[in-house]
Amino acid sequence: MLPYMDQVLRAFYQSTHWSTQNSYEDITATSRTLLDFRIPSAIHLQISNKSTPNTFNSLDFSTRSRINGSLSYLYSDAQQLENFMRNSTDIPLQDATETYRQLQPNLNFSVSSGNTLSSDNTTVDNDKKLLHDSKFVKKSLYYGRMYYPSSDLEAMIIKRLNPQTQFMLKGVSSFKESLNVLTCYFQRDSHRNLQEWIFSTSDLLCGYRVLHNFLTTPSKFNTSLYNNSSLSLGAEFWLGLVSLSPGCSTTLRYYTHSTNTGRPLTLTLSWNPLFGHISSTYSAKTGTNSTFCAKYDFNLYSIESNLSFGCEFWQKKHHLLETNKNNNDKLEPISDELVDINSNSRATKLLHENVPDLNLAVNDIPSTLDIPVHKQKLLNDLTYAFSSSLRKIDEERSTIEKFDNKINSSIFTSVWKLSTSLRDKTLKLLWEGKWRGFLISAGTELVFTRGFQESLSDDEKNDNAISISATDTENGNIPVFPTKFGIQFQYST
């Protein structure tokens, strides 16, 4: 479940029109969410409150070998921040948990053509962005957290300098470990690419990240084309000035929708040339209430590989319509009446409706124009061909929009998350749901291997309380035991 302060941070980005989908740090966020989700390791309770429209606080308790806790405080001067925040009772489950991330396409519109090539939704978004840029006011966010009984501190400051740039400062201080780390981020987002300069006092680490979006131009024949694909390429470079340790990686991401079903899918390919590590992922929404992800890792130097799988199963409310109870994931064919209804709600007509019927317009042609019969037949054939092609584009767009609207309008009550790795022989199970105003997460991680305990450190053995009998080892039995188990409760007002 997404922590409360992360929800506030996401609301701050939304209120200040800062997109996180262009960040190289989150380029593989979908696969990480479906495969590497966090399992609670103890009984955890989080109570949060919005004391004023601009201040938020949170209190955490956990019982892991002893009672631990933390106190968090956040302040922001963003005026519309409260419009994006909801308490634990009202927030939709799909917004309170990390799940499949749907991206917005990056369209390249010509300046001279204005909005003639843009879709209705994109036009509205561009108008909002232009209005925001013209009336931009600098916004800030201040966050602090103190842990007890260790008295560790962490802090974060975010400054929106202008509509395209942002400055972030993060700090961690630990008296017990004599650790004090300060990290600075300067980000510049030009919509087509996002550049990020990073400096950390730990090893005097310097870093540079960049993510470039290959913008696509809509068709000249389509004044309302729903562009459903996005291609991005990013890279990062690191250098520790003290140890002179370099680091780098690059990732390619492709996001699109299936034109037949409207279901989104994401493909990524990552490469680390220094360590010879190659990773590829495939993530897809297989239905309105199910998601699947597969990841393959391979190392060029050690010839080691790993295959991981992850999936999600969402449960809706039981009082749905009878027609949708048995066919939650079945997309019905779009009828002509539905297309006409959707067209009336848009400012721009559908494409095939803009094509004139030459058979009806032949009487309106001036008598001075004498069109031969064979040319008239050719024009009619071309009109029919273009009309059918444009109708197909409209139906594909309507299918994609229908699938997205079906997910957004659904009310989910719980979700099951499963993840497994063939090399590590682990199985992670997580259940997340809502109950009487509480957001609940409960899960466990199971291990199916004999030599797993030897690979763990002493701290992990003590924390997880793992013990394997000598009889199982001598007999060669493969033990099945949980390395983690916990439950987490969140409540916010």
Swiss-Prot record:
Topological type in the membrane: Multi-pass membrane protein
Q: Where in the cell is it found?
A: Mitochondrion outer membrane
**Coiled-coil blocks:** none
Which biological process, per GO, is one annotated for this protein?
Answer: mitochondrion-endoplasmic reticulum membrane tethering
Pfam families assigned? MDM10
What are the entry keywords? Membrane, Mitochondrion, Mitochondrion outer membrane, Transmembrane, Transmembrane beta strand
Checking InterPro entries in the record gives: Mdm10
- One GO CC annotation, please? ERMES complex
Q: How does it assemble?
A: Component of the ER-mitochondria encounter structure (ERMES) or MDM complex, composed of MMM1, MDM10, MDM12 and MDM34. Associates with the mitochondrial outer membrane sorting assembly machinery SAM(core) complex, which consists of SAM35, SAM37 and SAM50, to form a SAM(holo) complex.
UniProt comment concerning the protein's domains: Lacks alpha-helical transmembrane segments, suggesting that it resides in the membrane via beta-sheet conformations similar to those predicted for other outer membrane proteins and porin.
Q: Which family does it belong to?
A: Belongs to the MDM10 family.
What task does this protein carry out? Component of the ERMES/MDM complex, which serves as a molecular tether to connect the endoplasmic reticulum and mitochondria. Components of this complex are involved in the control of mitochondrial shape and protein biogenesis and may function in phospholipid exchange. MDM10 is involved in the late assembly steps of the general translocase of the mitochondrial outer membrane (TOM complex). Functions in the TOM40-specific route of the assembly of outer membrane beta-barrel proteins, including the association of TOM40 with the receptor TOM22 and small TOM proteins.
Q: Which HAMAP family match?
A: Mdm10
Q: What PANTHER family does UniProt report for this protein, alphabetically? A: MITOCHONDRIAL DISTRIBUTION AND MORPHOLOGY PROTEIN 10
Which protein is depicted? Mitochondrial distribution and morphology protein 10
Provide the species name.
Saccharomyces cerevisiae (strain AWRI1631)
Question: What does the record give as the organism's lineage?
Answer: Eukaryota, Fungi, Dikarya, Ascomycota, Saccharomycotina
